[in-house]
Amino acid sequence: MDPASIWGNRWINSNQSIAKKYMETVCKKQSLVVLAADKKTMNELNKLIDDVGDYISALKTHVDLIDDWTKEGWRDFVTKAKEKDLLIFEDRKHGDIGKIVREQMGGIYDSKSWADLITAHSVSYTHLTLPTKRIV
């Protein structure tokens, strides 16, 4: 499926790389599904990718809810998600001034390095440039 023929004017008029990436992924996988990956362990997250990764377009994660989180384990999870052509949507809802939010996107979880999208409250939006790859 060609994104331009499926999405029409949305594709043509979009100037956001993440929107186009999502539309391309949807067309490739023939799925609009963004699955809330509200799991508590790395094993549960990895099993979720094994079970449904071929049938969804994106995972919405909460990295700070993972009880057994390690940098290496999360890196392996991200690699596995990318191998399945999944976008990763980190649901953080950052809501501070831009400088603080940028620092929060680094930190122990370093979400700016692996998330395709990160949620933020509108109080922050004027100080941030999305998608996350442009923040730093």
Where are the model-predicted features located?
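Glycine/small-residue-rich loop that forms an oxyanion/phosphate-binding "nest" at active or ligand-binding sites
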Residues: 86-122
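Single conserved hydrophobic/aromatic residue that forms the stacking wall/gate
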Residues: 127-136
